[in-house]
Amino acid sequence: MYAQEAQQKPEAQQSAPAAEQPKPAEEQAKPEQHVTNPNAAVGKELSEASHAAEGEEEAGEHMELKHSTMVKTLAKWLGVSVETSYWIAMAFNFAIVFALLGWAMKKNLPGVFKARNESIQRGIAEARAASDDAKRRLADIEARLSKMDGEVAAIRAVTEKESAAEEVRIREAAEADVKRILESAENEIDAATKQARRDLKSLAAGLAIDLATRKLHVDQQTDESLVRSFVAQLGKDGK
């Protein structure tokens, strides 16, 4: 097979120069043009020569592949032309490539999809856990706030109750102080009144005795009797 390909390559190379031989004649047939810029003309010729060489190289490779021993053997085996055998071989090669790609994708993609699915599920689980934790914290904060409102209301109620009780106690204490002061004042006034009465009675008794002694002459026994009677009467009035 390789010997036949080696034999066909010189034939293709010989056929390629044969196909290129008419080109100088065609170029000679072209009329000469007046060149104003030598550098531009040289660059244009080099570009055309490069494109022509690339095209000839691609055409040569294409011809070598099309007229290879394998393609010719396949053409003989299938009973078709070399051109048809070439396209059948190309289609078969593409089919093999696509089959290998499909097999590789079928073998590797399930694992990739599984890993990706697991990663997505793990991310969803983590997001759900974070959401549940955030909800739990929010519920805890709301419960604390509601409890705090209740505690504040209870403290306010206790404070108001204690304030009312303290106000009542202060009022009662003030009333008791006023009552005690009034009673003390009344007692002092009563005591002063009684003392004044005793003083007046004593003064009146003294004056009466003095007046009586001046008007009447009594003996000592009568005088003592009058004094005892006055003292007894004074003791009754002082109670």
UniProtKB/Swiss-Prot annotation:
Residues 23-33, 45-64 have a biased composition (Basic and acidic residues). InterPro entries: ATP_synth_b/b'su_bac/chlpt (IPR002146), ATP_synthase_B_chain (IPR050059). Residues 1-22 have a biased composition (Low complexity). CDD domains: ATP-synt_Fo_b (cd06503). GO terms for molecular function: proton-transporting ATP synthase activity, rotational mechanism; proton-transporting ATPase activity, rotational mechanism. It is a single-pass membrane protein. It comes from the Bacteria. Keywords: ATP synthesis, Cell inner membrane, Cell membrane, CF(0), Hydrogen ion transport, Ion transport, Membrane, Transmembrane, Transmembrane helix, Transport. F(1)F(0) ATP synthase produces ATP from ADP in the presence of a proton or sodium gradient. F-type ATPases consist of two structural domains, F(1) containing the extramembraneous catalytic core and F(0) containing the membrane proton channel, linked together by a central stalk and a peripheral stalk. During catalysis, ATP synthesis in the catalytic domain of F(1) is coupled via a rotary mechanism of the central stalk subunits to proton translocation. Component of the F(0) channel, it forms part of the peripheral stalk, linking F(1) to F(0). F-type ATPases have 2 components, F(1) - the catalytic core - and F(0) - the membrane proton channel. F(1) has five subunits: alpha(3), beta(3), gamma(1), delta(1), epsilon(1). F(0) has three main subunits: a(1), b(2) and c(10-14). The alpha and beta chains form an alternating ring which encloses part of the gamma chain. F(1) is attached to F(0) by a central stalk formed by the gamma and epsilon chains, while a peripheral stalk is formed by the delta and b chains. This is ATP synthase subunit b.
